[in-house]
Amino acid sequence: MIIARKKLQLQRLWRQRGCRVATYICLGVLVLFGFVYNSKGNSMSSIKSDSAAQQFDDLDDLTNKELPGGPDPNTIFRGSELGNYEPKEPEIPSNQPGEHGKPVPVTDEEGMAAGRAAEKEFGFNTYVSDMISMNRTIPDIRPEECKHWDYPEKLPTVSVVVVFHNEGWTPLLRTVHSVLLRSPPELIEQVVMVDDDSDKPHLKEKLDKYVTRFNGKVIVVRTEQREGLINARSIGAKHSTGEVVLFLDAHCEVNTNWLPPLLAPIKRNRKVMTVPVIDGIDSNSWEYRSVYGSPNAHHSGIFEWGLLYKETQITERETAHRKHNSQPFRSPTHAGGLFAINRLWFKELGYYDEGLQIWGGEQYELSFKIWQCGGGIVFVPCSHVGHVYRSHMPYSFGKFSGKPVISINMMRVVKTWMDDYSKYYLTREPQATNVNPGDISAQLALRDKLQCKSFKWYMENVAYDVLKSYPMLPPNDVWGEARNPATGKCLDRMGGIPGPMGATGCHGYGGNQLIRLNVQGQMAQGEWCLTANGIRIQANHCVKGTVNGFWSYDRKTKQIIHSQKRQCITVSESGSEVTLQTCTEDNERQKFVWKEFYQSS
């Protein structure tokens, strides 16, 4: 009865003209909406097709609340089969020294003298390098699994940017040769060599003539004045036409099948930056070897509060989603020298901050910017690149000589990206408090434009393992030069690690004489802690995860006291040695006056 009554009411309602008109209108709207939605879907499909044509999937890992840089389903492990980009034939060694990355010994006096002269001029032994083939073979020290990965057939093209200033001839050109020798030719758009105002004759007309053999694949761009590594890299990126810009230092050798593993994560998400494993090339013998010992030992990049680069084991959280030890993994930061990044993404990020000079701090500026602005950084175990570590810096900072360039750079990074966490940098580097970072308004505007996240978000979601090794620093109680008026000497770490603390003439430049003593009793110089070892004070690595100690400063007696030993730091009568002795208030060699030292820009 109820159903019949409802049916009769509906029939009466339908007979009313207004109701019928309203129904027809609703049906029409639904049909029109369906047509528009379908057209929009087709339009979106077209956009996706265009994106695919650019070789980027541009997937957003954050749709699943995942950080960018997770496992790539399009990179497939083939088990016992060789991967699709693995070389089919081994490289043929030359009959020159140094093949297979072996060291080249020099024992004659004339050769050793030539090596010393070369090292003084270039920071490494180019005398030995000149004996070695440009196309020498090097050992494949990748993890065994790396030989069995398939990468997408369509990978983005690459512009390799190599910046140099007064570089040695063969190390520079061996870098270029190795890239062209060990890369799929269809992926190398160009090699861009950026000459940062070199004045050595071999880097002028001779170099221009040499690169013509590469038939336009290698170009030389010259700066009009000394720009420094950071700005010169941005210049190189602006001259690049490849979809990805890949930066190498000017003294590298790339290893077997190094390139596809770097490109696959970028293809999946264009906002991911990739970093190869860096192997070592000895600056004297030119031996190629692993830095980490085992090829299966992987580390991610972190930092301590003075913004010194450190490495640590991969976190359990990051390991959990990796089925294979050879898969890429996320890293909070990177060492700065070697990496690949989508060219247009790099441009959106403003390249490097134009206010950063020469070198120093750029790896943090880029790392913080990438992570906080929606991108990610991954280390790639299957991509290996050898790098020569110089014995010393063989050239000056040019017009920036005498300026605290690195401190200025760091302050720009700190003030732009670290928010309230900047206080920990200034606790670690108090002398930089008054350093003027220059105008950072453009960087702050970029951060606002890109809607970048806070540094607190970065520390909690990306760099969460930093605090395990490097906790937030308590305030300094006293810091600066600790001068003993009786001798006129200042406490000095003396440079040895481990090594005893001494006392030397106060020079006013900070360095080994810039001591910090925090409110929890830890005394340190730079990243080194000063601890009691018998009656001596020893400089050594700080115990990771600690910020406390046994030191205190008595402002009344002016003594530096070790509470556990109940002894005071004492300068010897000769004024050079420092020991712990029984505290005596009238002992003038136990009194210290602290003078804070500030850098100026």
Curated annotation (Swiss-Prot):
Transmembrane segments: 21-38
Keyword Transferase recorded: yes
Pathway(s) the chain acts in: Protein modification; protein glycosylation
Glycan attachment residues as annotated in the record: N135
Biological process according to GO: protein O-linked glycosylation
Membrane-related topology note: Single-pass type II membrane protein
Cofactor section: Mn(2+)
Binding-site residues, substrate: D196, R226, W359, R390, Y395
Family that this chain belongs to: Belongs to the glycosyltransferase 2 family. GalNAc-T subfamily.
Domain remark text: There are two conserved domains in the glycosyltransferase region: the N-terminal domain (domain A, also called GT1 motif), which is probably involved in manganese coordination and substrate binding and the C-terminal domain (domain B, also called Gal/GalNAc-T motif), which is probably involved in catalytic reaction and UDP-Gal binding.
Name used for this protein in its record: Probable N-acetylgalactosaminyltransferase 7
Gene (UniProt): gly-7
